[in-house]
């Protein structure tokens, strides 16, 4: 079994059925970034842009990838006990991942890989609310 990979999934304003809410467990990344290399067991930091009113500029939870195609990623949504702010990401992402994160202004539904350490830096001091 391969080690999981870690990603930031950027969510803009949810507009089903093409763009879903983070709690739905379905993510439709911008197709121009396909193919998506996610595999079951990979982890997503679910970041909401300023246009996502309910969770603006925050990471309210993580996703564990269940399956991925060229148009959508299905995941198990797990809320965090305390959301992570954009400032938390700016402070805790490693330099290479922070440089990628600065490019979110180009797409409100962008998916990009980050290091395991960056992922842990964000979630380490927060609990995951298991159902």
Positions of the model-derived regions?
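Compositionally biased, charged N-terminal/linker segments
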Residues: 1-40, 113-114, 119-131
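Short coil-to-beta transition motif at edge beta-strands of beta-rich domains
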Residues: 34-52
């Amino acid at each position: 079994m391969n080690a999981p990979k870690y990603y930031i999934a950027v969510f803009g304003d949810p507009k089903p059925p093409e763009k879903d809410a983070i709690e739905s467990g379905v993510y439709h990344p911008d197709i121009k970034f396909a193919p998506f290399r996610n595999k079951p067991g990979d982890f997503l930091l679910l970041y909401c842009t300023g246009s996502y009113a309910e969770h603006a500029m925050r990471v309210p939870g993580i996703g564990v990838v269940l399956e991925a195609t060229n148009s959508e990623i299905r995941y198990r949504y797990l809320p965090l006990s305390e959301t992570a702010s954009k400032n938390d990401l700016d402070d805790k992402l490693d330099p290479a991942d922070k440089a990628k994160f600065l490019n979110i202004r180009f797409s409100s539904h962008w998916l990009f890989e980050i290091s395991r350490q960056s992922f842990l830096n964000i979630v380490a001091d927060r609990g995951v609310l298991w159902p």
